[in-house]
Amino acid sequence: MSNIKLIVGLANPGDKYEQTRHNAGAWYVNELARVCGVSLVADSKYYGLTARATLYGKDVRLLIPTTFMNLSGKSVGALANFFRIAPDEILVAHDELDMPPGVAKFKLGGGHGGHNGLKDIIAKLANDKGFYRLRIGIGHPGDKSMVSNYVLGKAPQTEQRLIEEVIDEAVRATEVLFKEDMSKAMHRLHSYKAG
C-alpha cells in the first residue's frame, strides 16, 4: 500500500503555458482530479490549485503550483509543512526530456537533472531528495541550446497523443500503487508501450 499523501503536478501558470510540454505534470494531476470527481481550486496559502481527494480509498492532497516552474518549491513546501507531509509521502509529476513521448516512469529520490521545478522543491524540502517522482517523457530537441523553447512549446499532435496515452496509463498505474505497492505500479507503467 502506498504512503503517498500529496501528489504534485508541475507547471507554469496561465493560458499561455497550459498546453506546453513543461506542463505535463499538471495534465496528470488534472486527470487524477477528474477520476476522483474533484475540482482543483486556487488557494493562495499554498500558492497553487489544490484539492482534497479520496484516491483509490486513500485521502490525498492534489496540488498544481501556480508559481512559475522555478519557484515550485514555495508551493510544495508550504502545503507539505502545513499538513506535516514528509518528503517520502510526496509524488511529484513532471516533464522529462530524457525519455521519449509515450514513456513514463516512477522513481524514488535522485537529483533534479537540470529540472528547475525539481531543483526548487529539493531546496524547499531542506535538500531532502527522498520524494517520489513520476517522470513523463516529452523527448529532447537534440541540442541543449534549444531546450527552453522546446519545453515551452506545444508538442506536435502525434507526440501529444502519445503523452496523453501514457498519462492515462500513469493514472491506471497510480491505482496499482495505491491498492498494491510501488514495485507493481512501476512494473505496470515501465512495461507500457504507447501508440
From Swiss-Prot:
According to its UniProt entry, the protein's GO biological process terms are: protein quality control for misfolded or incompletely synthesized proteins; rescue of stalled ribosome
Q: Which class of enzymes does this protein belong to?
A: hydrolase
Q: Which UniProt keywords apply?
A: Cytoplasm, Hydrolase, RNA-binding, tRNA-binding
Mind telling me which residues the site (Stabilizes the basic form of H active site to accept a proton) is annotated on?
Answer: D95
Can you list the GO cellular component terms from the UniProt entry?
cytoplasm
| SUPFAM superfamilies the record matches | Peptidyl-tRNA hydrolase-like (SSF53178)
A single Gene Ontology MF term assigned here is: tRNA binding
Q: Where is the active site?
A: H22 (proton acceptor)
Q: Which residues bind tRNA?
A: Y17, F68, N70, N116
Reaction equation(s) it catalyzes: an N-acyl-L-alpha-aminoacyl-tRNA + H2O = an N-acyl-L-amino acid + a tRNA + H(+)
> Which CDD domains does the record cross-reference, listed alphabetically?
PTH (cd00462)
* Localization, UniProt: Cytoplasm
Enzyme Commission number(s) of this protein: 3.1.1.29
Point out the annotated site residues (description: Discriminates between blocked and unblocked aminoacyl-tRNA): N12
Subunit record text: Monomer.
Q: What does this protein do?
A: Hydrolyzes ribosome-free peptidyl-tRNAs (with 1 or more amino acids incorporated), which drop off the ribosome during protein synthesis, or as a result of ribosome stalling.
Under PANTHER family, the record lists:
PEPTIDYL-TRNA HYDROLASE
Which family does this protein fall into? Belongs to the PTH family.
Descriptive protein name: Peptidyl-tRNA hydrolase
Q: Which organism is it from?
A: Shewanella loihica (strain ATCC BAA-1088 / PV-4)
Q: Which gene encodes it?
A: pth
